[in-house]
């Protein structure tokens, strides 16, 4: 089995964000110290990186499922959770990332192109990690001073992608099976491709680095083509994707073939027809030269056979009439290889300069609109507010007469994933956010009535509930005692001296009030003393005397008063 794999389907998932913490600060002499729950850590992302040391996608065939590390949950004392580590996956230079399309459980086919990793070190974030949930310390504000909940971490992005390897080479060797392409790449470079005397020996592309003086260039040996390959004959056009990145196409023609109906000119025309069929299906990268416009070079091989050399000399003028450069070589005797090497080096130098010029012109012609730098807190403000374009509400109905309202939008779907539905206060916070965004108003506009089913989100992550716009905003104890609005600690509203620190003005006022009260008591006692109430017991025992200390209609403890 070959260890070369140039197309795989990979399932990637970013790490989940950690949950926020709903901690309460506990400190001596501070019974109402407030919330101190930290935020959850963000999940790690899955990143493809072009690596010059990688040459195949074989690892992803046997391990197609890759997942990044999740973030940890927040802790008390406003300690944020740690961020999950990013998962960096090395891929060969020239790898193209496509979105995988197709029904679940069946083979996928490439969809939209997501990235083209053409240079070593290029990176693409294929699955972003989820954001960590906010702790209750971050949720506290002027009106919600003691949140009893925190937000959950968001799940990481999850998707299927297709990786296609398109070899980066300067020269592509194309030709019929057994034309000598593998022998040529082995003779000009240090590559060791499989060589045998039967067709379709080469089943995978081979790359070789050729040295011409101080210059180096790469040649690619593409598996053999036959007429009708565009309709699936032979190996089809499966491996022709490897010539998309090559700037020079070299036709290797077998001049010693004995197959009936074949000659060098007919072989060239047949291959050009297949290339034209394939070129019409391509979407070339920025600055690339279309395949029909790329320079061709004709290599007449196997001239070590006498009849083949005569045929090569005969057809050479015919190719030159078409404006093509022709080289007569033999991979067995190495005849003409040195001249071919220098000719390819000069052609590669010119094409590299041409491609660089095209890319620069394309970049200058592109209009890049850069958004203004947003303030630091813009994201949080946008997360709370919104406009009518942030979501959509549609009325849905199935064949059974079941009716529901579907709410879709980035913010509502994110908020649903962040909500802990086991916490009534968190559910109420979600209701407040949706109402502030305008979801309730839009539901009324669409004709929704209390009790109608509402679904927020798509697929398995959708949340269903019965809409009740009149739900109470405050939480309740088990006995029905109202606790107040969400996030409001009623203890903070009490005038308890232990919960409030007096100002200096209040201390002075209370001190003067206390001293005035004591002075009034002393003056009253002094007046009673001067009136003789303390010296005459009969006056003190008079229950009709309103000015005495023991009067006011009270009966003596030792005996009844005589009438």
From Swiss-Prot:
UniProt region (Disordered), positions on chain = 525-563
Question: Which amino acids does the record list as binding GTP?
Answer: 175-182, 200-204, 221-224, 301-304, 330-332
Q: Where does it mainly reside? A: cytoplasm
- Tell me where in this chain the OCT domain is found: 383-469
Any one Gene Ontology BP term: ribosome biogenesis
Write down the required cofactor(s).
Mg(2+)
EC number(s) stated in the UniProt entry for this protein: 3.6.5.-
Q: Which InterPro entries match?
A: G_OBG (IPR031167), GTP-bd (IPR006073), GTP-bd_Obg/CgtA (IPR014100), GTP-bd_prot_GTP1/OBG_C_sf (IPR036346), GTP1-OBG_CS (IPR006074), GTP1_OBG_dom (IPR006169), GTP1_OBG_dom_sf (IPR036726), OBG_GTPase (IPR045086)
Q: Which GO terms describe its cellular component?
A: cytoplasm
Q: How does it assemble?
A: Monomer.
User: What is known about what this protein does?
Assistant: An essential GTPase which binds GTP, GDP and possibly (p)ppGpp with moderate affinity, with high nucleotide exchange rates and a fairly low GTP hydrolysis rate. Plays a role in control of the cell cycle, stress response, ribosome biogenesis and in those bacteria that undergo differentiation, in morphogenesis control.
Instruction: List the NCBIfam families hit by this protein, alphabetically.
Output: Obg_CgtA (TIGR02729), Obg_CgtA_exten (TIGR03595), PRK12296.1 (NF008954), PRK12297.1 (NF008955), PRK12299.1 (NF008956)
PANTHER family given in the database record? DEVELOPMENTALLY REGULATED GTP-BINDING PROTEIN-RELATED (PTHR11702), MITOCHONDRIAL RIBOSOME-ASSOCIATED GTPASE 2 (PTHR11702:SF31)
HAMAP family per the UniProt record, alphabetical: GTPase_Obg
Name-wise, this protein is: GTPase Obg
Q: Which organism is it from?
A: Bifidobacterium adolescentis (strain ATCC 15703 / DSM 20083 / NCTC 11814 / E194a)
Instruction: Tell me the name of the encoding gene.
Output: obg
């Amino acid at each position: 089995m070959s260890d070369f794999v140039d197309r795989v389907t990979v399932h990637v998932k970013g790490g989940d964000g950690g949950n926020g913490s709903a901690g309460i600060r506990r400190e001596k002499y501070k019974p109402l110290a407030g919330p101190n729950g930290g935020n959850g850590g963000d999940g790690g992302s899955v990143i493809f990186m072009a690596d010059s040391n990688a040459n195949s996608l074989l690892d992803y065939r046997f391990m197609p499922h890759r997942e990044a590390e999740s973030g940890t949950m927040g802790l008390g004392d406003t300690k944020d959770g740690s961020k999950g580590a990013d998962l960096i996956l090395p891929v060969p230079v020239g790898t193209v990332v496509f979105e995988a399309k197709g029904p679940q459980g069946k083979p996928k086919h490439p969809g939209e192109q997501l990235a083209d990793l053409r240079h070593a070190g290029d990176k693409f974030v294929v699955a972003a990690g989820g954001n960590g949930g906010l702790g209750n310390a971050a949720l506290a504000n002027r009106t919600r001073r003691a949140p009893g909940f925190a937000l959950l971490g968001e799940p990481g992005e999850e998707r299927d992608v297709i990786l296609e390897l398109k070899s980066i080479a300067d020269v592509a060797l194309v030709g019929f099976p057994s034309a000598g392409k593998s022998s040529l790449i082995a003779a000009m470079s240090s590559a060791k491709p499989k060589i045998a005397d039967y067709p379709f020996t080469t089943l995978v592309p081979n790359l070789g680095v050729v040295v011409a003086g101080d210059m180096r260039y790469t040649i690619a040996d593409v598996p053999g083509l036959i007429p009708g390959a565009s309709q699936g004959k032979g190996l089809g056009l499966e491996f022709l994707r490897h010539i998309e990145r090559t700037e020079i196409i070299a036709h290797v023609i077998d001049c010693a073939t004995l197959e009936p109906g074949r000659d060098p000119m007919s072989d060239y025309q047949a291959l050009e027809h297949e290339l034209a069929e394939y070129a019409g299906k391509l979407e070339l990268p920025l600055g690339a030269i279309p395949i029909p416009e790329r320079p061709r070079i004709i290599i007449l091989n196997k001239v070590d056979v006498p009849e083949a050399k005569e045929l090569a000399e005969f057809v050479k003028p015919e190719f030159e009439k078409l404006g093509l450069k022709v080289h007569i070589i033999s991979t067995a005797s190495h005849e003409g290889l040195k001249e071919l090497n220098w000719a390819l080096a000069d052609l590669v130098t010119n094409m590299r300069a041409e491609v660089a010029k095209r890319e620069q012109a394309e970049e200058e012609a592109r209009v890049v609109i850069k958004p203004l730098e947003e303030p630091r807190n813009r994201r949080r403000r946008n997360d709370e507010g919104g406009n009518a374009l942030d979501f959509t509400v549609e009325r849905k109905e199935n064949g059974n007469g079941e009716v529901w309202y579907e709410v879709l939008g980035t913010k509502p779907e994110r908020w649903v994933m962040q909500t802990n539905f086991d916490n009534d206060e968190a559910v109420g916070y979600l209701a407040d956010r949706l109402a502030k965004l305008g979801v309730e108003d839009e539901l009324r506009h669409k004709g929704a009535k209390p009790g109608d089913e509402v679904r927020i989100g798509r697929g398995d992550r959708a949340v269903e509930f019965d809409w009740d716009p009149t739900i109470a905003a405050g939480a309740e104890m088990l006995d029905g005692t109202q606790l107040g609005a969400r996030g409001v600690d009623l203890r903070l509203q009490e005038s308890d001296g232990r919960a409030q620190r007096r100002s200096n003005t209040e201390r002075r006022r209370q001190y003067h009030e206390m001293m005035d009260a004591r002075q009034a008591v002393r003056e009253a006692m002094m007046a009673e003393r001067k009136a003789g109430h303390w010296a005459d017991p009969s006056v003190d025992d008079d229950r009709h005397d309103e000015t005495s200390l023991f009067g006011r209609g009270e009966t003596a403890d030792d005996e009844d008063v005589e009438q």
